[in-house]
Amino acid sequence: MYPAHLLVLLAVCVSLLGAASIPPQPLNLVQFSYLIQCANHGSRATWHYTDYGCYCGSGGSGTPVDELDRCCQTHDNCYGEAEKKGCYPKMLAYDYYCGGDGPYCRDIKKECQRFVCDCDVEAAKCFAKAPYDKENYNIKTRCQ
């Protein structure tokens, strides 16, 4: 083998090792972010919802601070119901589309996929309707 071939092979192996250390993004959460963008017509970036109030983002406790935070609490509860049904809501892929008046679930036959898609579509539509108060971003320390 030529030295140049060895260098290319080594570079590929190092790249693969680096990529293997990147944790995979749950597919459903990626789809959920697309649904949010569809519902709000791109008016607010998805990351604005990742650490909002007491329930938007990872975990949730205390009393929701406003309507948007209640949307997140309802979404968390919906995922909890999905888990009780034996579904894995953060990992399930489903079929949806973005119409002029917002996101919709396509004709989904599998119960778990349909349930989770409905959770996400309803939350995305709720986010789009609720006012966003930037004072409620990054306040988890106030949530009990």
Curated annotation (Swiss-Prot):
Q: What is this protein called?
A: Acidic phospholipase A2 S12-65J
Catalysed reactions, semicolon-separated: a 1,2-diacyl-sn-glycero-3-phosphocholine + H2O = a 1-acyl-sn-glycero-3-phosphocholine + a fatty acid + H(+)
**UniProt GO cellular component terms:** extracellular region
Q: Where does the record place the catalytic residues?
A: 75, 120
> Which residues make up the binding site for Ca(2+)?
55, 57, 59, 76
The UniProt entry, under PANTHER family, shows: PHOSPHOLIPASE A2, PHOSPHOLIPASE A2 FAMILY MEMBER
> Which species does the entry assign this protein to?
Austrelaps superbus (Lowland copperhead snake)
Q: Name one GO molecular function term.
A: phospholipid binding
- Any one biological process term the GO annotation gives: arachidonate secretion
Q: What is its EC number?
A: 3.1.1.4
| Disulfide bond entries | 38-98, 54-143, 56-72, 71-126, 78-119, 87-112, 105-117
Q: Which UniProt keywords apply?
A: Calcium, Disulfide bond, Hemostasis impairing toxin, Hydrolase, Lipid degradation, Lipid metabolism, Metal-binding, Platelet aggregation inhibiting toxin, Secreted, Signal, Toxin
State whether keyword Secreted applies: yes
Annotated family: Belongs to the phospholipase A2 family. Group I subfamily. D49 sub-subfamily.
One Pfam family, please name it. Answer: Phospholip_A2_1
Q: Which PROSITE patterns match?
A: PA2_ASP, PA2_HIS
Top-level taxon of the source organism? Eukaryota
Chain positions listed as propeptide in the UniProt record: 20-27
| Obligatory cofactor(s) | Ca(2+)
Predominant localisation class: secreted
Tissue distribution of the protein: Expressed by the venom gland.
Protein location: Secreted
Q: Which residues form the signal peptide?
A: 1-19
